[in-house]
Amino acid sequence: MTHYILAIDQGTTSSRAILFDEKGSRVGQSQQEFPQIFPDDGWVEHDPEDIWSSTLAVCRSVLKDTGIDAQAIATIGITNQRETTILWDIDTGKPVYNAIVWQDRRTSGFCQSLSDQGLSEKVQEKTGLLIDPYFSATKIRWILDNVDGARETAQSGRLAFGTVDSFLLWRLTNGKSHKTDATNAARTMAFNIHTQEWDDELIELLGIGDVLFPEVMDCSADFGVIDASWLGAEIPVNGIAGDQQAALVGQACFTPGMVKSTYGTGCFMILNTGDKAIRSEHKLLTTVGYRLNGKVTYALEGSIFVAGAAIQWLRDGLKLFADAKETQSLAKQALNDDSVYLVPAFTGLGAPYWDPDARGAMIGLTRDTSVADIVSAGLRSVCYQTKDLVGAMAQDGATFSSLRVDGGMVINDVMVQFLSDLLEITVERPCVTETTALGAAFLAGLQVGLYQSLDEIEVLWKADKCFEPTMEKGTGDKLYQGWQKAVDRVRTRD
C-alpha cells in the first residue's frame, strides 16, 4: 500500500497543497492565490481568514483532483511564510487584527528606539537576529499598542500568538494544539536559539509578556491531529518548519558547508553550519536550520525581501506582461540590460544592508530602453542581491563551489544561467523545484517512520540541471559594480 504525505505550503502570495508519495514524487498539487493588503506605505497585511480558507480549499482540492482518500494520507507536514504574525482570542478563535506580514516595516521606529537603548548586542547574542521590523516580536507589540482591546485580551490570558504554522495548526485541530517548531520560533526575536526556549528577559523588554506563546517542538514531532470534519479523516501533523528551513531539508543540505537559495516572493540563502551557531560580523542572521531529536543544526542566513515580488510588480503593477512565464523569452530579447538596473527596495533592503527606509528605483533608463530590458533588469536584480549575500558569507569565512536553488523563479533558465555567470560557481537545480513543500513532507515522514534517517532522504535528491559559468571573465564584476552604485543611490543608512 502506498503511503501519501500531504504537504501544506502556506506562502506569502498563495497557499498550496502538494501530495507526495513516500519516494518524494509529486502526485498532485493545488494552489490558490489570496489578496495582499497594503494599508499604508511599507505596510503589508493578510486577512487570516484568507490564509485559512485558501489553505483548506487547496487541501480539499488536491484530494478531489487525485481521487485519493484522506484515509490514505499517513501524515501532514506544514511549511509557511515565516515571521508573519497573528494574534487571536482563544475563546472565539478569531484574530484580533490582520496578519502583519514579514515584509511589513511599520515598526521601524520602535526598532530604532530599541537599538538606541543599546539592545542590539543582547538581541543578537540571544536570538542570532538583528533588531528589525522583519521579525515577529515588534509586530506583536504594535498590535497590543494599536488594536482596541488587544492588550486587555492579553492581560486576561486569552490572546494567543502564532506564526502562520501555529495559527493553521490551531484551526486544523479545532483549538486543541497551540504549538510551533524551533525554526519558526527562531524568527520571532523572542526565542533564545542557544537554550531553545522563549526568552523571558527579551519578552519583558519588548512589552509582550501577556501574550500566550506556543509550545516549541522539534521539526519532526507529534504536533496534533486534524479534526475529521476538515478533510474527512483524522490525520496527524508530524512535520513543521519555516519555508526556508523546509527548503534546506528538501534540498538535502545536511552536511555543514552546503548552501541553498530559494527564490519565491523573497530570496533566502541558507548555509548549514552544523552544531555551531556562527555569529555573523557582516549582517547575516544566525538561525536554526532544523531541530531533530532535540539536536539543533544551525545555519547562517541572508534574507532578501523582494525577488519574485519584483516580477509580480512588473506584471501586476506595470502590466508589462500577462504571465511570469513570458519573462524568459522577454529577457532573451533584451539589448540594453547591461546598463539598466532595478533596485526593488519596495519595503526596504534586507541583508546585508538592513535599511528599512530605502525605497525602490530604476536606474539607467534611456529612450532606447525596452520592456525586455526592464524585465531582464528585474530578473538580474535577484541575482545581484544573491551576490550581495555570497559576498557577506565569504567575509564571514564561508566558501562553497556550488549552490542549490529552488522556488518558482528557478524554472527560468535565463535567470539561473546569469546567476551562475555572476557568482562564477556551479548552480544546481533539482528535479523537484518546490523543495519547500518536499522538506515539510520529509520532516513529517521521518516522524511516522516512512524514512529512517536523513541519509535515506539524501539519496532521493536528484539534480535536473547544472548551470556552469559561461560569461567572459571580468564581465560579471563590471555589471555588479553598476549594481552597487545603484544600491548606494537608494540607501538611507550605512
Curated annotation (Swiss-Prot):
GO terms under biological process: glycerol catabolic process; glycerol metabolic process; glycerol-3-phosphate metabolic process
UniProt keyword list: ATP-binding, Glycerol metabolism, Kinase, Nucleotide-binding, Transferase
Source taxon at top rank: Bacteria
Residues given in the record as ATP binding sites: T12, T13, S14, T265, G308, Q312, G408
GO molecular function term, any single one: ATP binding
Annotated glycerol binding sites: R82, E83, Y134, D243, Q244
Annotated binding of sn-glycerol 3-phosphate, by residue: T12, R82, E83, Y134, D243
Pathway info: Polyol metabolism; glycerol degradation via glycerol kinase pathway; sn-glycerol 3-phosphate from glycerol: step 1/1
Regulation: Inhibited by fructose 1,6-bisphosphate (FBP).
This enzyme's EC code(s): 2.7.1.30
UniProt-annotated binding residues for ADP: T12, R16, T265, G308, G408, N412
Any one Gene Ontology cellular component term annotated for this protein: cytosol
Catalysed reaction equations from the record: glycerol + ATP = sn-glycerol 3-phosphate + ADP + H(+)
PROSITE patterns assigned to the protein according to its UniProt record, in alphabetical order: FGGY_KINASES_1 (PS00933)
Its job: Key enzyme in the regulation of glycerol uptake and metabolism. Catalyzes the phosphorylation of glycerol to yield sn-glycerol 3-phosphate.
Classification via NCBIfam families: glycerol_kin (TIGR01311), PRK00047.1 (NF000756)
Family: Belongs to the FGGY kinase family.
UniProt-recorded name of the protein: Glycerol kinase
Organism: Marinomonas sp. (strain MWYL1)
